[in-house]
Amino acid sequence: MKPQSINSTMDSTIERLGDKLKTIGEVRERCGVGSISFGILHHGEVIFTGSTGHRDVLEKKEPDTSTLYTLCSISKSFIAAALGILVHQGKCKWTDAVGRYIPEFKPKGDVRVATKATFNDFLRHSGGLANPVVTLLGPEGKVLVSQEDFINVLNDAPNGNERFGTYYSRTWEYSNVSHGLLALVIERISEKRYADFISEEILKPLGMNDTVVYKSRLSSDANIAHSYVRLSDGSWCKQPDHEWTNECNTPVLAMVGIRSSIKDLLIWSAATMDAQWGEESKPLAALSNIEMNPLREVNSILNKAYWTRPHKDDLQTLSNFHLSWYKCVMPSSMVHWGSWNMSLADNGNKDQNYINENILGRDSPQQPLYKITGIGFCGTASVNLFPKTMSAVVVLGSGLNTGDPSDFTAAIMIQALFDLKKQIDIIPMVSYEREMRLRDWKSLKNDWNKHRDIYSVEHPAKEYVGEYTGLGITLTVRANAVSEGLQLIFNGREEIMQNLEYYNEDMYSYQPINRDNWLRGGWLDWDHFMVGILHFKRKNGLVSGVTWVWERGCDAALFNKGNT
């Protein structure tokens, strides 16, 4: 643990923060991840930073304020900021239909997704596109689709389902791919590669010199927090390095691939608040080395267009999703919004009494909170802005295992920073979350076993061999050259070939059902037993396609077999 007080005077606020270092170490241990780094901005000044664990567990290298973590969905805040600059320059409007800038965007189904859905719509996740991210991001951190082929994913992405109907302007449907679309539009409007625009228009003017949008910056000796997770036997596993940070694949970089540090995200937080609430007569200390804040249209990003995010806590304060940022008013259960702590906020496993009992600052004055979070197999991240005091709490974690360490650490530091009442003991929440995540896995595995029937008719493997196209990619099923089984290849990526296991008649499974193997492989969420199962379909007795339930609750996507 390496705390570092920036202020020369250890006032009561900094003392409270320092008292929480041991607790944050416990969070990391119980969540089973390699490292956590954090920083606190208060009254526009960086007052506290720290870290726990190792950015490289095997070599015992500790993280610091410049250590690089993958931002995952926090990357999306740069999309909104880039569009804000372009809107300010008069090159586009928030209310423009996005499809006018990219005519090859021709989604199947609801054409309004291209002809009417605006920048506002897509940034607040009401543009109508679903989230088939598993067709983009494969196991072991591999990217499955090139930038050139990304348009095929967009055009194939569902824009409704059988139960609900169309999504556009009717519901909040979180969509990574829609943000990839916006990044491509930014390239069209600016006539620059997205990475170049972000670097030249945002990162360099703000002095965010740690932040990485170019693959070449990721050398073997770079100050990177590698993703480590603790396995069931107590050993540490280094997960695969991902391919998400690459300027040559704008959609993936913009959605989830930017890497940054605590130092730079504190600048990012200060610049965002300064652009909206700053006063020229009172420059923020955190921006003392900045000649000019390049951020524009921040009020439009943070406070105008939004989609409500209803929740069921007993306080019922404001809860809206704006343009890449979420806004609530504390006290609220939604302080934990967007995290991988599934027992909190509006996430899946809901015990409302438990949620209400653990609301931070229930007896403290109300104040607005703006936040954005990131979740990936490689780690979690949490950025929290408090404009009332020009404060920010930023947390970055490497690895994802049993709970969201960044969210818990943010809660600990928010509570200490503002001395919230009544105080909540976070550690029992961490233990409960860990128990729930392991229980969920056991339940998932039980469902997988319950629906399996290995005694059903198994047809000759050669009937399934072929290429199946859908959702913008190709699934290749081939015979195993060594055994009598089948193998699955995602969109030509031979290096992540998966052996298929017989599951039921015309059904084969590729997902690991051993949790340690799931962690080793760097898989995305496996939240339903059918997500890892291919269900082959027949026409006139011959295999004609395969359906894939790629996400809990989605309609099964059909992949058509070639030459049928």
Set out the residue ranges of the language-model regions.
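Short, conserved catalytic-motif segment at the N-terminal edge
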Residues: 11-71, 91-93, 106-107, 155-165
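Active-site SXXK
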Residues: 18-24, 38, 44, 70-98, ...
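Short loop/turn motifs at secondary-structure junctions and domain boundaries
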Residues: 27-33, 61, 361-364, 373-377, ...
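Short, surface-exposed loop or secondary-structure junction motifs
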Residues: 45, 54-56, 110-376, 381
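A short acidic/small-residue loop/turn micro-motif
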Residues: 53-57, 400-402, 551-552
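Short, glycine/proline-biased beta-turn/loop segments that scaffold the active-site neighborhood
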Residues: 93-110, 204-206
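Peripheral terminal and inter-domain segments
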Residues: 316, 330-355, 359-368, 407-564
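Short, well-ordered beta-strand elements
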Residues: 380-385, 389-399, 546-547
